[in-house]
Structures are given as structure tokens and as C-alpha cells.
Amino acid sequence: MPQHKVSSDSPIGIFDSGIGGLTVVKAVQAALPSERIIYFGDTARVPYGSKSQVTIRKYAREDTELLMKHQPKLIIVACNTVSALALDVVEQTAGGIPVIGVLKAGAELAVQKTKSGRIGVIGTQATIGSNAYTCAIREEKETLEVFPKACPLFVPLAEEGFIDHPATRLVAEEYLAAFTGKEIDTLVLGCTHYPILRKIIESITGPEITIIDSAEAVASKAGELLAARGLLNQSPEKALPHLMVSDLPQKFRELYRLFMGTELPDVELVGM
């Protein structure tokens, strides 16, 4: 049983290490515009992907505890690193509240989309090092070939707002050269920061490679889960997200405006 009573009006809690989870917020808002969203970006401790597993699991517990104070009906882990290394910690801390991780949703979508059976995955050092994407993809279909590549500089570039910048293009060209000759037809953006850089990534990979953004898959999964439990918010009003960060709220506002293309309500600064 959940730790608290939930209703259709209860919020969806979403967390990530920084601004990357806004890609999930955007997808959930598009799919489920009436839902109230509580978002936490751990901007004081970003990036998670270069931390140890012990530290990542500690952060995952603390982030979930923060969201649980808002009595959510669903928690979305908008961080592939946590999805890969600490989803069990989130589930334990959530105490019966359903949890959706971006990693499994992205893996399932990649399996659906590939025609050649050759899938590339880019992610943080921790996510790629965990082998979680390869395992999740082969769990769906064991004959598929998976080519992983760690891209550790993408998160800091996104956090700096270098969305369409020559430095980002140079780094992306270096990383994506790893797929030359691999004949992949599908590329998983295995970090929620990476869709922020999607325009540059797509310009390098070309139109013949299908880009998998797990944010859209997660939003679809969230809608299905809430509908099955009778917890969809039926309000005709569009809800604005409640945004929390652990550092630099003004910078977060600027990046939110840049990425989401809209003004936003106040950003709450919380201590961790």
C-alpha cells in the first residue's frame, strides 16, 4: 500500500540531476496537459553520470524523499543513470507509489523501431558502464546487436546552454564517429539531457538513423498507468509545473526559457 492516499488530483513527481528531466516534463505536459507536475533538478550535484554507484544510490534516495513530501501518485525517474543503477532504491523509498524509469521505456521503444537489429546507445559514463541498456534491449529481443558509447561532455554542454554551439558540434562529431561502420539504424539518447542537443546529433547521424527519445515513451507509459488505476486528472485546466532545484535557480530559469520556449513560474530553491 502507498505511504499516502492518492487521487486523480495528486501530482506526478519527476526528478533528474539537472535540466535534462525537462525533456520529460515537456513530453508529459504534451501528452497529459491537465496533470500537476512536481519537478526536482539536483543542480547542486549535477552530473550524476560521473559519480560512484554508492553516491548515485544515495542521491536517488534523497531525491525520492523530497518528492514524497508532495504526496505524488506517480514518480518518474527522468535520469538514465539512476534508472540504470538505483531504480530499486527509488521503488523502496516510494513505498508503493508506482515508479517509471526512462531507461526501460527507451529500450522498449528502440526494439520496436529498429529494422536492422543494430542499435546504438549514447549515455553517461555510469549508464554505459552499467551495461543496463544492452541488458534491457536484449531482454526484449536477445538477437539484437547493441553498440554503446559514453558521451560524458554532453551533460555539461547542455547545462551551459550550448545547444547550437561550435564546441558542441566538435564534441558530438568525435563521439558519434564511434558508430562509423557499425551500420546502426537506431540511436538511443540514453540520457535525458541529450534531446536538448538533438538538432546537432541528428545533423551528424543523418535522416536514415531513427533517434529514440525516451521522454516520449515515458509520457505514453505514464498515461497508460494512470488510466489503468483511474488516476488521470480530468481537469480542463492546463497545469503549470512546480519546479525545484538545489542550486542556481536563476540559471535554471534561463535554461528553462531557452529549452521550453516559454516563461515559467517561480523556481523554488531547496536544500539537500
Curated annotation (Swiss-Prot):
The active site is at C79, C191. Its EC number is 5.1.1.3. It is an enzyme of class 5 (isomerase). NCBIfam families: glut_race (TIGR00067). This is Glutamate racemase. Keywords: Cell shape, Cell wall biogenesis/degradation, Isomerase, Peptidoglycan synthesis. The keyword Isomerase applies. Belongs to the aspartate/glutamate racemases family. Provides the (R)-glutamate required for cell wall biosynthesis. Substrate binds at D16, S17, Y48, G49, N80, T81, T192, H193. GO terms for biological process: cell wall organization; peptidoglycan biosynthetic process; regulation of cell shape. HAMAP family: Glu_racemase (MF_00258). It comes from Chlorobaculum tepidum (strain ATCC 49652 / DSM 12025 / NBRC 103806 / TLS). Pfam families: Asp_Glu_race. One of its GO terms (molecular function) is glutamate racemase activity. Pathway: Cell wall biogenesis; peptidoglycan biosynthesis. It catalyses: L-glutamate = D-glutamate.
